Amino acid sequence: NHCNRFEQDHPDFKTEIVTPENLQRCRDMVSKWYEVHEWNEQIEQEKTAISRAFDHFEAVHMDGLMLIENGEVIAFSMGARMNELYYDVCFEKAYSAINGAYAMINREFSRMIAQKYPELQFLNREDDMGEPGLRKAKESYQPTCLLEKYNACL
């Protein structure tokens, strides 16, 4: 399993809750992440959405968690509670060169959210943006259901 492998390869990793005081560390990490990924329109839209979420972190009552190794943020996840049953995992970023980082931040963030909001029943992991690898990863979590996504222009 990816998490077990990550723990073996990175025994000194830590988690840290994202706060307004350390949010800049996530901004710095995601900037580095975008530097090594090929630009496309979806990436640009995601980048804008993440920037807005950072700007309004407190106002929209977001939660976040970072994975840290040797003082460096190697992954983070952020989301917000939708209602008493649903939680929306809005963003998850990790360095893909670090085996298991995505699986580990997913697991640790899910555990944090389950502890903070024990009444929750569903985590919305959002859509796969048409990326086959992301779809495969999200389907590996055996979702309860998949919803159709629609765009509306006003």
Task: Explain the meaning of each model-derived region.
Residues 1-39:
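Acyltransferase donor/substrate-recognition loop-hinge adjacent to the catalytic core
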Residues 2, 29, 49-53, 108-109, ...:
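Short, hydrophobic/aromatic alpha-helical segments in well-folded domains
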Residues 5, 32, 56, 112-116:
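A generic secondary-structure signal
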Residues 7, 55-58, 139:
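Alpha-helix boundary recognition
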Residues 10, 58-60, 117-118:
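A structural signal for short coil/turn segments at secondary-structure junctions
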Residues 20-27, 44, 128, 132:
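An alpha-helix initiation/capping motif
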Residues 25-73:
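Short, conserved active-site entrance elements at the starts or edges of catalytic domains
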Residues 63-154:
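Aromatic (often tryptophan-rich) hydrophobic motifs at membrane interfaces
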